[in-house]
Regions:
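Substrate-binding/catalytic cleft of secreted carbohydrate-active enzymes
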Residues: 73, 82-205
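Secreted/periplasmic carbohydrate-active enzymes, especially glycoside hydrolases
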Residues: 1-86, 97, 101-102, 132, ...
Length: 205
């Protein structure tokens, strides 16, 4: 997308004390109608890639805006317009850079809950993923590039009921983006509360 960014400055004065807060943000409408994504009423085809949190030289994701700007500009040069973050949420620098470049993001809750922990069985992972996605949305929810959310990757357990509640919670709580229960591989079943579906091997779907 072609970003138009705004800065809001709020100042609180109380006697001799003064506090100022400035926030940069964008305004956009991101929704689904039928089988299509629409951005500000315009039918939009998403062409994306996945970031697997693989940063072997540092062991962690870049924390500076310039590094993420470089990544997103390279992606745009190849005709891509969105990125899924596999089982993690990138640092704030990624959202800032995506807003500057014009790139759609899908962060996820930090879990791949089929290697021990399982969703919907009353394990700590259930509350943990809700707490984490609430926290990341509270922190980064005003960034226009934050358009999609999943609880994590390829769940197991009684996951269909759990991710259905997850999607229902977010649709009712924050309509600024669209939601899917979890990003899944080739053989996971459809979860009917999803607003969209993330699936590997999309060609021939």
């Amino acid at each position: 997308f072609n970003p138009a960014l705004y800065k809001l400055t709020a100042t609180l004065n109380s006697g001799k004390q003064s506090e100022k807060k400035q926030v940069q943000f964008g305004m956009r409408d991101f929704k689904i109608e039928g089988k299509w994504f629409y951005v500000n009423g315009r039918k939009t085809m998403l062409r994306g890639t996945v970031e697997n949190c693989d940063f072997p030289l540092t062991g962690y994701a870049p924390m500076d805006v310039a590094s993420w700007e470089r990544v997103f500009r390279i992606c745009r040069n190849y005709g891509l317009n969105h990125m899924r973050f596999h089982s993690f949420c990138p640092p704030e620098a990624a959202f800032i850079a995506a807003d500057l470049v014009g790139f759609y993001l899908q962060p996820e809750g930090p879990s791949w809950p089929n290697h021990g922990p399982r969703l919907g069985n009353g394990q700590p992972i259930d509350k943990y993923l809700m707490d984490e996605t609430i926290a990341l949305t509270k922190e980064y929810g005003n960034y226009a590039s934050y358009c999609m959310l999943a609880c994590g990757n390829e769940p197991s357990g009684r996951w269909v009921a759990w991710v259905s509640k997850f999607v229902d919670y977010w649709k009712a709580t924050d309509p600024r983006r669209v939601y899917t229960g979890a990003s899944v591989g080739n053989s996971w079943q459809w979860q009917p509360h999803n607003e969209y579906h993330v699936k590997a091997g999309a060609r021939g779907l």
